[in-house]
Amino acid sequence: MINFFVDGQPIPQGSMKVINGYVIHSQGSALASWRSSIALAAKAAGAKPHLEPVEIDLEFTMKRPRTVTRQEPSVAPDLDKLIRAVLDGLTAIAYRDDGQVTSITASKTYGERPGVSVKVGAKLPVTLQ
């Protein structure tokens, strides 16, 4: 299992749009930069592409806007879109394909240091008796 933290405001991987026949992500360059940061942090932590099923734990920390008083970030960006960006950023770094991910635990909270804490490891096989 490898553990690492990626500094920076998490960027969601939103829907794709077709403009003039080209498919683009709604976040464009910000998303590409965020996924690159994820890949670099994973490599620095010693990630190697797993060949077996993997499990992932993600803890997103969002910067609380000054005017917000609620305790939980129950607004955009959607947690599933944040997860999608991380999974794509780890493809070919921590596993060959994100289809190998068979278990995900994820949460998002407010905090002073925005980013995502990532844990990736081989999923232990279940033994039947």
Language-model regions: role of each:
Residues 1-129:
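Acidic, proline/glycine-enriched N-terminal capping motif
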